[in-house]
UniProtKB/Swiss-Prot annotation:
The active site is at D237 (proton acceptor). SUPFAM superfamilies: Actin-like ATPase domain. CDD domains: ASKHA_NBD_FGGY_RhaB-like. Pfam families: FGGY_C, FGGY_N. Involved in the catabolism of L-rhamnose (6-deoxy-L-mannose). Catalyzes the transfer of the gamma-phosphate group from ATP to the 1-hydroxyl group of L-rhamnulose to yield L-rhamnulose 1-phosphate. Keywords: ATP-binding, Disulfide bond, Kinase, Magnesium, Nucleotide-binding, Rhamnose metabolism, Transferase. GO terms for cellular component: cytosol. InterPro entries: ATPase_NBD, FGGY_C, FGGY_N, Rhamnulokinase. The lineage of its organism: Bacteria, Pseudomonadati, Pseudomonadota, Gammaproteobacteria, Enterobacterales. It comes from Escherichia fergusonii (strain ATCC 35469 / DSM 13698 / CCUG 18766 / IAM 14443 / JCM 21226 / LMG 7866 / NBRC 102419 / NCTC 12128 / CDC 0568-73). ATP binds at A13, S14, S15, G16, R17, T259, Q304, G402. This is Rhamnulokinase.
């Protein structure tokens, strides 16, 4: 029996994990084992919201060392993280400034300024990327405007996964799927767009040409002295999650559910027409030249903040209490910018309900109900937008990532969207990370080949839409009201 042992480092906004994957060639089976799990989160430092990259690096090394201490031969390592954030280095490879997080307020007003000076349509035609106030394009402009004293010292700008790969190997790389999240990569050339870079104030010399997933960046030398290849996987965690989504046919959509919810479909060509621009659709890079045509949704970040503020430790109990409440009494727009990083999430949610003359969610369960119903309704709206964009309805939705364990939200999503939902795999980003490593090791042919492995080894659960549910009736009522308004217009 031939085995491959691959290690995936998967960093999310709230936690990170080092996972060991064992692939058996003859039976094409893949098993995962968690080696080390650790917390991640936002920190306040010198007036900025930052990441503790030193702590994250220590946790990564601890996890890798644990694998080596077990005497396991590691065939390769891959790292994926969230998008848009970066670390600046000087000529000697030392950090310049702070690793500022995307939830920091330093970019306030800069997205509007870019649209005014460059033109919203021109930016979109160049990048194909949705407008989000924390995109790297605006973060770099904030840096160069607010901290000009740092500029003479900067030699390199590495996105988060590339930074951690650099720390392991001493080699620099700019991986394509994550680079596209910056809104700085030209959608036609797959290279940095000089006009957008110039507006940001960044020097093009800070960046190398983006490389597509699958190349070996360099080698990590383990404590035993072995050189282990570090592979440039699809290093944006959503890109990895989509690779592991067992999409079957052109009518399948995906929803990567975690701190963020990212809903979309795969395409061989980008969508950059006026309809896509109006809907703020993004065309992020994927593996094998595919595009991830999707939309960002604020996701379970709202719930995470409520759990933290209310000191709730028993999530299953909260979900059970939430499920017992009537649906759609408290509805908010989870994508409202006021929810990006408020001082108090509970108070912000209550304020929106108060301002819109709705009942006020007071209890933990009511806040949970508000979040779950609002997310499911937004999922339905976004899925409808995506279907209109491509001119074909979807027949099923694959929910992957940690959020797919929330069976209540899965059923609400199926009911609101009116289509079959398939939940799983949970560790989608980790699996997609492993998939690219196995392709680099010549164990698998391509993404479709890997998805067959996932379909046969992952635990998948199907949720059938219930047209008689409260949320389904609510959606039908909304559609009827919209149609009436359109007829009367």
């Amino acid at each position: 029996m031939t085995f491959r042992n691959c290690v995936a480092v998967d960093l999310g906004a709230s936690s990170g994990r080092v996972m060991l994957a064992r692939y058996e060639r003859e039976c094409r089976s893949l098993t995962l084992r968690e080696i080390h799990r650790f917390n991640n989160g936002l920190h306040s430092q010198n007036g900025y919201v930052t990441w503790d990259v030193d702590s994250l690096e220590s946790a990564i090394r601890l996890g890798l060392n644990k694998v080596c201490e077990e005497g396991i031969r590691i065939d390769s390592i891959g790292i994926d993280t969230w998008g848009v954030d970066f670390v600046l280095l000087d000529q000697q490879g030392q950090r310049v400034g702070l690793p500022v997080a995307y939830r920091d307020s330093r970019t306030h007003g800069l997205m509007a300024l870019a649209q005014k000076q460059l033109g919203k349509s021109d930016i979109y035609q160049r990048s194909g990327i949705q407008f989000l106030p924390f995109n790297t394009l605006y973060q770099l402009r904030a840096l160069t405007e607010q901290q000009p004293e740092l500029i003479p010292h900067i030699a390199h700008a590495l996105l988060m996964p590339d930074y951690f790969s650099y720390r392991l190997t001493g080699k620099m790389n700019w991986e394509y799927t994550n680079a596209t999240t910056t809104q700085l990569v030209n959608i036609n050339s797959d290279d940095w767009d000089e006009t957008l870079l110039a507006w940001s104030g960044a020097n093009k010399a800070w960046f190398g040409r983006p490389t597509h997933p699958g190349n070996v960046i360099g080698h990590w030398i383990c404590p035993q002295g072995n050189e282990i290849p570090v592979v440039a996987v699809a290093s944006h965690d959503t890109a990895s999650a989509v690779i592991a989504s067992p999409l079957n046919g052109s009518r399948a959509a995906y929803l990567s559910s975690g701190t963020w919810s990212l809903m979309g479909f795969e395409s061989q060509t980008p969508f950059t027409n006026d309809t896509a621009l109006a809907a703020n659709i993004t065309n992020e890079g994927g593996a094998e030249g595919r595009y991830r045509v999707l939309k960002n949704i604020m996701g379970l970040w709202l719930l995470q903040r409520v759990l933290q503020e209310r000191q709730i430790n028993d999530l299953p109990a909260l979900i059970a209490a939430t499920q017992a409440l009537p649906a759609c009494r408290f509805i908010i727009n989870p994508n409202d910018d006021r929810f990006i990083n408020p001082d108090e999430m509970c108070s912000e949610i209550q304020a929106v309900c108060r301002e819109t003359a709705q009942p006020i969610p007071e209890s933990d369960a009511e806040l949970g109900r508000c979040i779950f119903d609002s997310l499911a309704l937004l999922y339905a709206d976004v899925l409808h937008e995506l279907a209109q964009l491509r001119g074909e309805d979807f027949s099923q939705l694959h929910i992957v990532g940690g959020g797919c364990q929330n069976t209540l939200l899965n059923q609400l999503c199926a009911d609101a969207c009116g289509i079959r939902v398939i939940a799983g795999p949970v560790e989608a980003s980790t699996l997609g990370n492993i998939g690219i490593q196995l392709m680099a090791l010549d164990e698998l042919n391509n993404v479709d080949d890997f998805r067959q492995v996932v379909s046969t080894t992952a635990n998948l659960t199907t949720f059938t839409p219930n047209p008689d549910s409260e949320i389904a009736h609510y959606v039908a009522q909304i559609h009827s009201t919209r149609q009436t308004k359109e007829l009367c217009a």
